[in-house]
């Protein structure tokens, strides 16, 4: 009957709302997670004290951000300023009016797009709450509205919570600069106490590193029969301590169980995000202590030591001591450490990239402290473009293969890579962050690597540090006097998996950067939502998603898009 046909059409229509709601909820989960990380860093900054657990290690950056925010700095004690700035930063999470402070870093054209499309993020928590409200029963089911809020919620992460997490981590722990490290399971040491830090919050890992370097703890380790203490990292916590301290990187997300399987891990100490619940039961098969430290990530079969800024020192000391005392419980017959490891140069923050470029700038003729040398390389065609390679590795595909093969293909075509998170660790383990990897590059990029003394894949940090990439493209667009969407730059998450990756993808696209995925997002059940993400949003923000599971074709698509953008610019 006509009635039943009409109802059938209604039901078919509802699928688009269901898919759109799920996409928005996924985004909100990722945005909340990254932004809560940033909030914790702001709280830690509020506890900073010259005689306390946490100190201000980059006062110049704190002063620079304060001036950017219109805060008076003259004559202020640096710790008073830190406390004032932390309170202002925390207000960004719940302020009743206005939009995020860091949005002003974007080019004017981008800011105008955000205002016109009504996606400029307001208070961070408001965007998450609004997303959950919109997806409650009886609220939004219009795909356009749901996708628009997904972009807004993502922007509150990338230009809000993540950016604060990045900037104030630099203030507390030091702004990264190029430093040598090693990557892969071969960084574990058979004759030392091995402590693995895993998760995302540098507040924990920095303190563990402090006490692992303590002469008293090292002496105690030798007393217990070890030659010393070796700290290595997994996941984004690893990126944090690698780029500031040169701490070796044992592996990324899908390597976390393998560090326990070496039989040489005295303790795996975790904070939040991307932690396998299976680590508890697995650790019981060995002598490993599985230590959780956050009320946000409590798990079975773990030893829980509540970690906070006020008690950080005593907590970290207790954990390091526990690991040392566990060394004697190793079972030699279960110890197997693979010999594989690679050299890597990491720590290319935005500030470090500027300083690296200054080394190849003729200061007698050209202004230093800018991205002009990079723009000139791109405009001249010596470098064809850049790809931000980010995101997870994924058990649905052969882990890390897409990251590594795409990077090799891109650098061979003179495309420089900036990488973060698990993608960065994949590159490091494959030797692509070794300066000798220049030999895999096309002639133009190889020459740039030689002149600037850099690897072809630049380690820019953890997943929250994709905010550094946003600042980089914003400043490059300003230097080139073009819009971000016109730059021969694309983003790629070939093995994305987590909710955070969806939030990242949304803020990268909303910033005007075409983004390429190698794993399908959970929207294929709706032609309308799929159409919006792969095409429709381009009318809003001048960028969109491309999904291609064939990795070779994905690489070709990125190269073609870069050349298309170059042709449009006439360079």
Predicted regions and their residues:
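Structured alpha-helical segments in the cores of large, soluble enzyme domains
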Residues: 171-185, 212-221, 251-258, 276, ...
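Conserved mixed alpha/beta catalytic, RNA-binding, or beta-rich assembly cores of soluble enzyme
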Residues: 8-9, 145-178, 182, 191-249, ...
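Mobile "lid/hinge" segments at catalytic clefts and subdomain interfaces of large enzymes
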Residues: 14, 18-21, 264-333
